[in-house]
């Protein structure tokens, strides 16, 4: 059997978003800033895409749904509940497909329009920027023998879009702090708990008395409203790992427009 055209098999490779709202998420030759959108009310904002590659690149933009699990991973939603459907439908953005020249930026406008009578609360979806592969030349019939496949990676960047309606509150707790290992290296394990009607997003830090910098830190930690507890294992700073045992202070500092705000702190002894 001869095919004159190669059949292309696309492999999607999603990327988890980077920690801080002011940072840039990147995959391939695409940078996205900011990496997290919070919309309060009807006022919108902008996202800047930057093509840092040497070739023209095209990206398709779509609204996707993800659910967080207890270990912090984000799973695709197969069957959306009513809240997720509402979140997906209220997010407005333009354009939905962009072609960006090398070393040039592109602005995406984004806003949310809540349906009349929608209850106060937090609604979240995720914006996916997926690369569109350039067209491939068709092999001449004389060169196409049998069935051939070509794997073309399709890269994507996903960022959360959080819509908040009303005066929402959240409380965070830190529990079960203990020494652990991550990929065979020393680490700190702990559980973050969340209560309230909104998500939280910030940094987890572990301090030892007399040492200025954290002996362990995890930036950009989110706890979304679908979970109440998130388990974490944070690698220790290799230069400070030998002094980890003993009394420590662990805190969770949320990133806000007005600077970092401490939401939780606990003192314990690492054993």
Model-based region annotation:
Residues 1-11:
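Bacterial N-terminal signal peptides that target proteins for export
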Residues 10-19:
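Bacterial N-terminal signal peptides
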Residues 25-56, 97, 171-185, 193:
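Beta-sheet-dominated interaction scaffolds and their linkers
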Residues 64, 113-162, 242-270:
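Terminal connector regions
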Residues 79-116, 212-242:
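Intrinsically disordered, low-complexity Pro/Gly/Ser/Thr-rich segments with frequent PxxP/GP/PP motifs
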Residues 180-271:
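Intrinsically disordered, low-complexity segments enriched in serine, threonine, and glycine
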